[in-house]
Amino acid sequence: MEAQTLYEKLWSSHVVHQEADGTALIYIDRHLIHEVTSPQAFEGLKLAGRKPWRVSSIVATADHNTPTDHWERGILDPVSRQQVETLDANIREVGALAYFPFRDARQGIVHVIGPEIGATLPGMTVVCGDSHTSTHGAFACLAHGIGTSEVEHVLATQCLLQKRSKTMLVRVDGELGRGVSAKDIALAIIGRLGTAGGTGYAIEFGGSAIRALSMEGRMTICNMAIEAGARAGLVAVDQTTIDYLRDKPLAPKGQAWEQAVAYWRTLKTDDGAKFDKIVELDAAQIQPQVTWGTSPEMVETVSGRVPDPAGIGDPVRREGIERALKYMGLAPNTPISEIPVDQVFIGSCTNSRIEDLREAASVAKGRSKAPSVKRVLVVPGSGLVKRQAEAEGLHEVFLAAGFEWREPGCSMCLAMNADRLEPGEHCASTSNRNFEGRQGAGGRTHLVSPAMAAAAAVVGHFIDVRELA
């Protein structure tokens, strides 16, 4: 049998029908649903007189619009409230494998709760009406975001029409330096590839530095794959994967567990398999990263400087840098460490898991929020993460430092609730996108790791977190 990449194994095992032009009908194992992209899909089903094909594939929660404070007040914005109430009505009507509504103790970001309850299992195809579904590729799943019309299609048929992607291996070998995390790897990769470098590809992340990461770190890497333009991000199964899933509520039990593990261990790229493209990075050379512009590819090391467009020969790229600098209110050649921070956001489906909160707390412990920093939001990714963090006393560390400890949700990542920036404010954010207006109209987002965000919070500007040790 011809050697296959991990992506090729996942793809071929889910093809229901193959067209001559390469388009295939792919079976979907897990359908994640939230309140923003599902109402129209459910309405379309009703208008067509259809019912969901397999409700046992559905895991649903409210996350984008839910407030992260004063839950007793409910959802004040009428549009947000309507979306959450519509999700609730739809799921209660049709059913689901798991549903965590607003105020449920397990409610949280869909890409956090899926893995933590064992709804995300190796070998699955996973879709959601959300760009960062690629997160689940950390479990050797073929996972990607879909549009609202595709949400309806999956509900109705449990299948999707797809074009096969090309394959790319991003190999990161070596040992990460102190203070450097998975988020820094992800940003360094995007800085290398650009936001279009992965277009048309499914990226497998490999190498000794990736294998050394926890599942939380691998989820961060795969979460950001979409920001390099990739269709999906993947990491092969190893003992770290298996240990993480053991005893999760929805993971197989008993003999079924042993059978599942035997299959999961095959979910890796075969020796001799060919990738369409290979990119290599040296982990030891990766430093803490900070984005300075309005795209994740506009990234520098914390010891670097904002670029000078005058030195850029390509007129299109030069114009893009000029526009970004104008929006961000930055002068060319400004040292990254001199960029002031007005707000800090520690959260999102990229960096809101327990390991991320521990990382931030280790920096915040014994320190206080800088007077110039208006607000620091710490938003756990789920109710279970919040409970564990509180059991470890992490919330007390944050509160003692003057940070705000919030309820779970998407929060300031995309400002669909009340958590947002004011025009002109700079934010050190552990989220995944720094587009214009992403965290509020006129807000200026800088993407960083949890440790770097906490460091900026206590100093008032960006600083190499290694200097605070």
UniProtKB/Swiss-Prot annotation:
Domain of life per record: Bacteria
Q: Which reaction does it catalyse?
A: (2R,3S)-3-isopropylmalate = (2S)-2-isopropylmalate
Q: Name one GO biological process term.
A: L-leucine biosynthetic process
Q: Which SUPFAM superfamilies match?
A: Aconitase iron-sulfur domain
Residues that coordinate or bind [4Fe-4S] cluster: C349, C410, C413
Q: Entry's PROSITE patterns?
A: ACONITASE_1 (PS00450), ACONITASE_2 (PS01244)
Q: Which Pfam families match?
A: Aconitase (PF00330)
Q: Which residues form the signal peptide?
A: none
Cofactor names: [4Fe-4S] cluster
Note on cofactor: Binds 1 [4Fe-4S] cluster per subunit.
Q: What class of enzyme is it?
A: lyase
EC identifiers of the protein: 4.2.1.33
The record describes its quaternary structure and partners as: Heterodimer of LeuC and LeuD.
Q: What family does the database annotate?
A: Belongs to the aconitase/IPM isomerase family. LeuC type 1 subfamily.
Q: Which HAMAP family match?
A: LeuC_type1
Q: What does this protein do?
A: Catalyzes the isomerization between 2-isopropylmalate and 3-isopropylmalate, via the formation of 2-isopropylmaleate.
User: What is the designated name of this protein?
Assistant: 3-isopropylmalate dehydratase large subunit
Organism whose genome encodes this protein? Aromatoleum aromaticum (strain DSM 19018 / LMG 30748 / EbN1) (Azoarcus sp. (strain EbN1))
